[in-house]
Design a protein with these regions (language model features):
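Ligand-binding pocket segment of bilobal, Venus flytrap-like solute-binding proteins
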Residues: 1-64
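Non-transmembrane alpha-helical segments in soluble domains
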Residues: 2, 20, 24, 32, ...
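Soluble non-cytosolic domains of exported or imported proteins
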Residues: 13-17, 32, 83-88, 100, ...
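Solvent-exposed loop/turn segments at secondary-structure junctions
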Residues: 36-39, 66-69, 85, 99-100
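Flexible, solvent-exposed loop/hinge segments that line or gate ligand/substrate-binding clefts
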Residues: 52-86
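Mature extracytoplasmic/periplasmic domains
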Residues: 76-138
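Extracellular/periplasmic bilobal clamshell ligand-binding domains
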Residues: 120-162
């Protein structure tokens, strides 16, 4: 982590798309970003950021650990509060969101990987981000969470990004 910190091309700033913009501007050679932003960039973010189409075309996405454990995948989740006033409808919504149709729609609109096995990623993600090949890390989030405190301590110890 200390070595990565020393090699930063610029102080961390902005959102994921700003990191790609930094590569395009020549401020750094490599950036870390969530891949679903590439889907938004390839589509110009619904016409709001047409310049980002060229940004997305100007970089290559590299997934780490494809020969080993695979790359971490962020997920979107849903939960039901204990004191929710309308539990039956909340459960119906949760069941629908876990359905193949909803997972497919979400993946195609938001460019995230579906959380349900067997539901395909959006064609854009498959074509541009993984070349049709992607191996996700299967480490449970609870296991990752066990290391959250020590990870935060290491970031503080090396003064990451300062």
């Amino acid at each position: 982590l200390a070595g990565v910190n020393k090699n930063l091309g610029r102080k961390p700033q902005g959102n994921d798309r700003a990191q790609v913009g930094g590569v395009i501007a020549g401020e750094c050679d490599l950036a870390i970003a969530n891949t679903y932003y590439f889907g938004k960039m390839f589509t110009g973010n619904g016409g709001k950021n047409p310049e980002q189409i060229e940004w997305a075309k100007g970089v290559n996405v590299i997934f780490p650990n494809q020969e080993g454990r695979g790359a971490h995948i962020n997920i979107s989740g849903i939960g039901l509060l204990k004191h929710s006033p309308n539990k039956p409808n909340a459960i119906r919504l949760m069941e629908w969101l876990a359905s193949d149709m909803a997972q497919y729609m979400y993946a195609n609109e938001n460019f995230e990987f579906p959380v349900k096995n067997g539901v395909p990623s959006s064609p854009l993600v498959t074509k541009y981000l993984s070349g049709g090949k992607f191996k996700g890390d299967s480490v449970p989030l609870a296991t990752i969470a066990e290391y959250s405190k020590i990870a935060s301590e290491l970031v503080a110890e090396v003064g990451f990004g300062r």
